[in-house]
Amino acid sequence: MGPLLIDFEGISLTDDDKKLLQNPLVAGVILFSRNYQEPKQLNELIKQIRAATNERLLISVDHEGGRVQRFKQGFTLIPPAQAFAELNDLEHAKSLAFDAGWVLAMELIAFDIDLSYTPVLDLGHDCLAIGTRSFHHDADIAYQIASSMIDGMHAAGMKTTGKHFPGHGHVIADSHKETPIDDREKSVIEQDMQIFAKLIADNKLDAIMPAHVIYPAFDDKPASGSSYWLKTVLRQQLHFKGVTFSDDLSMEGASVMGNHAQRAQVALTAGCDLLLACNNRQGSLAILEQLMILDKNQSLKTNKAKLLLSKTKITFDELTKSLEWRYCRDKLTKLNEKWADYASSNH
């Protein structure tokens, strides 16, 4: 198994998709809204992916809640991260965040999906790419609510991914469209990073996804392609022992690292264990070609993806019959209603 996670276009696998999944350098897949119609179809799609290869691939999705929840019909709607703190009751917010983490993880696991790239640890709501995905602008409040959501995910049996290290919240630009630059002073950026540092010290983050953001006070490369951030800071200073993902290498924020093949090489050299390449099949194929060349000189085989597989076994039918699921779903539905009222009165 290698370091690359890929995507595909449809609601079922094509022969080309299956062939790609069988490449020994592919570690798994990331799913999007375009891959989902309704629960029965998703169940069949996951079975197709599992049957395509003898290796157990890592099946992942962005399912944070709010505007970044790829599967909606038939799933519990997870409130956006900002909604929890708007309750103005920290203990209640933490309790609901635990429930949200548990529900989002259990529902995905019930479909044999291993991982949601959750939680977002960026501070503040001004960044276009982050906005309501952030728990709070106050680092301690964000830390406490995120920690509770992580506990809920872990209770369900899902690993967690903190993103976007060392912090994407204070750049206005959207890294999907350009490479943002955070030109604040070192001390301020280091303060933003403390939420990652504390959760690493608590042993709560299983994986970390760095930002496609440049921090000139430290380095001239995006964090996703910077050995300073990924090796010196994350591994040596913060003693992070988990898995590092690149964010999507097809995003415009990664373009300063070169073409797709070059981006992959830069990210690997900088210290990314696993690479995401989405929404551009030709780009993914170029990366795979480059990885095959690199693999001849130095083995790129890695078991890092296997560390993130879920071991919980439950069917969706079993889950939805449980009182715990129904209780949590009701509470989250009420929070969604409160958030809708808040959002409409603040626009």
Where in the sequence are the language-model features?
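Short, conserved phosphate-binding/catalytic loop or strand-edge motifs used
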Residues: 121-129
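Glycine-rich, aromatic-flanked loop segments that form ligand/cofactor-binding clefts
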Residues: 50-79, 97-122, 142, 149-166
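Preference for extracellular/luminal or secreted protein segments
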Residues: 1-27, 256-347
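Divalent metal-dependent hydrolysis catalytic cores, especially in the metallo-beta-lactamase
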Residues: 28-34, 114-120, 272-275
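N-terminal hydrophobic targeting/anchoring segments and the immediately downstream early-domain regions
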Residues: 1-59, 67-75, 345-347
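Active-site mouth loops of central-metabolism enzymes
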Residues: 3-13, 81-99, 178-190, 250-258
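Second-shell residues forming the walls of enzyme active-site clefts
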Residues: 34-52, 57, 69, 147-154, ...
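Glycine-rich anion/phosphate-binding loops
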Residues: 37-44, 88-106, 138-144, 187-190
